[in-house]
Structures are given as structure tokens and as C-alpha cells.
Amino acid sequence: MKTNYPILRQILFAAMPLVLLAGCSDTDDPAPIGVAGVEMSKPTLELSLDGTERLTATVTPDNAADKTLTWSSSDEAVATVSSEGVITAVRAGHATITAAAGGKTGTCALTVNPDIYVAGSVYDGNNNAAVVWKNGKKLCSLTDGKQNAYANSVFVSDGVVYTAGNDGKPVAKVWKDGTELHALTDGTQYADASSVFVSGGAVYTAGYEYNKNGTPVAKVWKDGTVLHTLTDGKQYAFANSVFISDGAVYTAGYEGNKNGWYIAKVWKDGTELHALTDGKQSAHAYSVFVSGGAVYTAGYEYNENGKSVAKVWKDGTVLHTLADGTLDSDASSVYVADGDVYVCGVEEVSENVYMLQVWKNGKVLHSYTPADQKEESYLNSISVWDGDVYTAGYEGSADGYPAKVWKNDGELYTLTEDGYASSVFVYTGPER
């Protein structure tokens, strides 16, 4: 039988468009549009320790198929971030906040700044009142100003503020969050608390109390009770600084000898560890810091010409002589960070003209010129965090003694127009 191929081909060609049309549908979805980028509302952000802020992130293009954002923090010990982009500071430091969508990310470089606490006093024209400042603003008054009183040292542990000083009676005291925690002495003899340090929940204080013979005796208290009586009361002695390291209690101060000169000393657990000077000239040790098992002390020693010379000792031996001894100088506080030794104090740069100094590893790092260089000015305390150097003290002027905090090479805060800034503490947040 003969097949009619031409007719069959015509039928097939006529049916092909119908087949092709049947394979296409108006309901097919177009390819989804991907995310091109994520842009943060702020590329950088600074927060205080108790700070919060909400960031927003914009996903492009606007018609991207999936614009769902996922938020994360590179270090939740520094800051956390919620699913809505709310950042909550936890501890001073640096973290990267990331918003991610569709395989793309936007970032914000976050810095959480520490809180700066200062202990000192405010003069009202009649008396000094003991005061604590936080970030440049008065946090609390420890005394009522009816008698001269001074806050000499501040230490912050897990957000609790401890302060040491005297109440003007004068009774050596420790305050906790502005309220009296311990009266270290009974007020029958003059006493002062010079330094406070908190470790393992215990509160250590260094200072002195006069005995019945009118001689100051260097002491260390723990939780309000005498822990160590450092000297026997035969010669004048003062404990100026306390530091706890690996459970050991280090104290710096000075004690007189029979010739009437003071010897700079360091005690460990109540026993003399180092006599820093030989007693041929008077010397004072004001500050002790322990790092890597080494004991650093700052103070001064008089030379044979009767000039005080600022010095730093390490493990009982002179590490740095900070001035040449031609004119007076003094080192009041030492801090060790990342192996570098920072010291603050004052140096006479010409006859009766003074410069506030910060030294690093024995060399001048920062110099501050007081408003009136012929008036008494002083840097009392130093602290270092993240490479930034904080110092506290006061400048002399004809109108008073403005208490100030400096950061690196510039003034950070003027705390009061007439008073003293005795101690600075950089609080970085809760213990890890």
C-alpha cells in the first residue's frame, strides 16, 4: 500500500505550533532577584558601657526576593545585638556588628568606651568635701563639707564603686557606692586611708593611723579590720598604695630612720620586701603595681643637692631615673600595660616653673602646661586602657585649683574649678 507522506508532513507541521504553545504558560515565575548589597545606617559607632542603640540596614535592590536580615556580633563579651538591630554594650572593647541578607553583609565597627571614675575633693571656700566623679560629672558627695575631708582613691569592681579617704574628723574610711562601708579607725587619733583595692570580693585599704605617742603607723586593712601593721610606731611611717596579685598583698610607702630621713619601701603580706633607698637621703614611694610577677614602684629620692628626683623601681632596683636632678621632680603613680611602664608626676623645668609630665618607659610621653606654671600643680594618678593614657590631678591658678582629667595629650574633663583629683580608675565592665 502506498503511504501518502506529503499529507502526513502537512498534518505534523500544522500541529507543532499547538505543541509549542501548550509547553508555555503565563503562570511561570521569573527568576528571583538576588541581593546586591547591605548598607548599614552607621559604619562606625561608639557607646558607653551602659549604652544601647538601634542600627538599621538597607538591602538593595529594593525588589530583592529575600530581604530578611540576620544580625550578629563578633564579640558578645563586648556587645550583643538583637534580631531588630538593637546593640547593647556589655564591656569596653571593640566588636564588629554584621547584618546579613542573601549572602551579602553590611558591617559597623563598634567601640564600647570605658567609664572614667575619679576620687577627689571640692573646695567651697571654707572646706573640702570628698567627692566621686563619673565620666566628668559628679556621681556622689561622700561628706557634707562641714569639715575638711578627702577622697584619696577609687576602685570599681563589677560596677560597685569603692572609695578610700577620711571624713574630716578625721576617721579613715571606705565608702561603697557613696555610703560608708567601713570606719577603719575610731577617731581617737588622726588617720587616713590612702588607697583601696578590691580582689576576690575582699576590700583592701592602705593608710596610716597615729598612735598615742603622735607617730603615724603604716597599716593595711581587709574588710574593715587591720590585716597588717607594717611598722612598729617608733618612726613616722605611711602606707600610700596597695595592690593585690595572686593573693599576695603589696604595699608601698615610706618609713623614717633614726637620722630623720624617710626610706621608700615595699611590703609583701605585711613583711618588708624591698627597701628602695639606703636612708642617706629622704625618699617617698607613692604607688605600687604588679605585672608579670614583677613589682613596680614610683616615687622620688632626694639627691645630695637637696633636689627630689622622680624614679621608678622594679623589684627593688631603680628602673628609670626620670629627671636629671638639677631641679625638683616627683613620680606619683605607676601603671604597667602590655609590658610598657607608664608614670605620671611633676617636673620643675626652670626655677619655680612646673610642668605636668607623663613618662613611658623612662621617656617623656606627654607634657601638660598648667595655666599658671608658678602655682602648685600636680598629677596624682595614672591609668591606661587600649593604648589611651588617663591621668588625674589639678592645676594651680590665682583663682583656685581646677581638678582635671587628661587623656593622652589633651584635657578630657574639668571636674571642678577648685579642688583636687586624687585618683583615676578606668572601668571596663563586669569581670569576664
Where do the protein language model's features map onto the residues?
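Bacterial N-terminal signal peptides that target proteins for export
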Residues: 2-12
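Short, ordered beta-strand-loop transition motifs
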Residues: 12, 81-83, 126, 350-351
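Sequence-pattern detector for short linear motifs
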Residues: 12-13, 363
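Hydrophobic alpha-helical transmembrane segments of integral membrane proteins
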Residues: 13-14, 57
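C-terminal motif of bacterial Sec signal peptides marking the signal peptidase cleavage site
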Residues: 20-23
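Extracytoplasmic soluble-region selector
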Residues: 25-114
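Residue-level hotspots at or immediately adjacent to binding/recognition sites across diverse folds
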Residues: 114-432
